[in-house]
Amino acid sequence: SSWIAAGTAYTNHDIEMIPVYIFYSMFGFQRVGDLAWAAGDSQARGFLIGATAGRTTLAGEGLQHQDGHSQLLASNIPNCISYDPTFAYEMATIFREGLRRMHEKKENVFYYITAMNENYSHPEKPKDCDEGILKGMYLFKEGKNKGKTKVQLLGSGTILREIISASEILSKEYNIDADIWSVTSFNELRRDGMETERLNLLNPNKKPKKSYVQECLSKRDGPVIAASDYTRAFTDQIRPYTDKKFYSFGTDGYGRSDTRKNLRKFFEVDKEHIVAFTLSALAKEQLVGSEEAEKAIKKYKIDKEKDFPANL
């Protein structure tokens, strides 16, 4: 309520304020969803920061605190702009744009940005990535191992780091080139895809416009492997807006009390599972032999008989 009061002070008291409210991501939209909608209805401006976000970033606190769906809840509020960045430069770029839109352009929007409870090194900001960060995805690293087989790896939040590690294994051990895409907002990509699809349907006599996802991926080779620290419904949002074979992975199910490493293994979003799933996806496209995927499954001791995590 205090955040809403500050976020609407520009109209109620003629005082411009940009409030920043940091909270446990699980205790945001899930616990006070009515207030989030009230913020949208009242045209509040400001930043909501969902800390300790993602199903596996908060180790040891089980199902009550491990967030696998706050981004999906945020996606339903029309004037809520939501992001799931991985690195500090992404967060800074998003904050700067948010200040520009809300303070300079006077747009009646508010931002939901998730932040992880995990320490890791942050790389130098790549050149010319601001537009991609804000639109929802950009090419973090291009596979240049000159391998004959290519794959497109998409990741957001803390799981992008598992994607990066998986790409290194694929390159060194399997001679597979992976283009790594940092997806800062599956939600914004979906909104762009929906708008583009609608525009094309309303203009049947014109050349179809490409969604931003299509612009990024259409000229790239290989299937798409997308993973996040949220349920598969989060990454699945962009499936209709790419023509490529698309595989999504996430953390469907209840949270569990364990280490980050074990949690990611359980939910099958660690680097080992991503490597094995990527090889299987490539085998289905007849780009690698199925025996390579079988060997990887055995090598990483992945239990084929284990039930789907959401059923456990």
Give, region by region, the residue ranges found by the protein language model:
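Thiamine diphosphate
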Residues: 1-76, 82, 89-99, 164, 235-236, ...
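Secondary-structure boundary/capping residues
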Residues: 48, 82-83
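Single, functionally critical "micro-switch" positions that shape active/binding sites
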Residues: 86
